[in-house]
């Protein structure tokens, strides 16, 4: 007797949600969250095409200085980090800010920690 195949149910649509916390640079006035949101809308690629966001498949929302990206298609958190770094480089902020994952679904923009004391010690030796 042949094995009986079980019918598989339809997969639920998986909605991915990632957040980017730009609080510190926006408060200090070195970065504009609205400009960054516009950059993401222009650069995120869906099906190999940038700028269209897949007709509502990917959505970007901004609340104060936090930007959230919601996607119904497979979307990499790493890709979001790549685009963020590209934006920082374009605006000459890459030397002061870094992109750090603070939770599984979010990134945060932090300043590099530069220890003044260590630099002074190395300069005098």
UniProtKB/Swiss-Prot annotation:
Molecular functions (GO terms): RNA binding; structural constituent of ribosome
Highest taxon in the source lineage: Eukaryota
Any GO BP: cytoplasmic translation
GO CC terms in record: cytoplasm; ribonucleoprotein complex; ribosome
One matching Pfam family: Ribosomal_L22e
Keywords: Cytoplasm, Ribonucleoprotein, Ribosomal protein
Subcellular location: Cytoplasm
Entry-linked InterPro entries: Ribosomal_eL22, Ribosomal_eL22_sf
KW Ribonucleoprotein (keyword) present: yes
Subunit organization: Component of the large ribosomal subunit.
Role played: Component of the large ribosomal subunit. The ribosome is a large ribonucleoprotein complex responsible for the synthesis of proteins in the cell.
Similarity comment: family membership: Belongs to the eukaryotic ribosomal protein eL22 family.
Protein name per the record: Large ribosomal subunit protein eL22
């Amino acid at each position: 007797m042949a094995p009986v195949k079980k019918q598989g149910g339809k997969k639920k649509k998986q909605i991915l949600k990632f957040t980017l916390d730009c609080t510190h640079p926006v408060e200090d006035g070195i970065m504009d969250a609205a400009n960054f949101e516009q950059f993401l809308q222009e650069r995120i690629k869906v099906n190999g095409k940038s700028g269209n966001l897949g007709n509502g498949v990917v959505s970007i929302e901004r609340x104060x200085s936090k930007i959230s990206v919601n996607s119904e298609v497979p979307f990499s958190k790493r890709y979001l980090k790549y685009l963020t770094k590209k934006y920082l480089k374009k605006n000459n902020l890459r030397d002061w800010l870094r992109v750090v994952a603070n939770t599984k679904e979010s990134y945060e923009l932090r300043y590099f920690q530069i220890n003044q004391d260590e630099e002074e010690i190395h300069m005098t030796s």
